[in-house]
Regions:
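Hot-dog-fold acyl-thioester-processing enzymes
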Residues: 1-54
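HotDog/MaoC-like acyl-thioester-processing domains
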Residues: 1-4, 54, 59, 63-65, ...
Length: 106
């Protein structure tokens, strides 16, 4: 399991005062970088060999600016050319968001 600490930015909040739903995709992409490096250690975009086929999020609790979040990432399934990742966002030790992403290696 991979773990990444992220400090939410004020610009990631919305009018309701919590982190905007669009922000999670950015956080999950950052959390996937170590996995990308397994396929492309130098992250050379001209030799990129992964494509996202699916992504879904479940928003369980609000996340707020000013408190660090922990993003945990794990490989949950491996197929012939694809693999599934599970992401989880925790703030103050509470699971706030879970996500599933399917990447295809070509």
């Amino acid at each position: 399991m991979l773990t990444q600490n992220i400090m939410p930015r004020f610009s990631e909040t919305d009018a309701l005062g919590h982190i905007n739903n669009n922000t999670y995709g950015v956080w999950f992409e950052a959390a996937r970088e170590p996995i990308y490096k397994l396929f492309l250690p130098n992250l050379n975009i001209k030799k990129w060999c992964l494509v996202m086929a699916h992504s879904s999020n479940d928003f369980l609790k609000e996340v707020f600016w000013g408190e660090e979040v922990i993003v945990k990432t794990a490989v949950s399934k491996i197929g012939n050319s694809s693999f599934e990742l599970k992401h989880a966002v925790y703030q103050k030790g509470v699971l706030c968001t879970s996500s599933k992403t399917v990447l295809i290696h070509y």
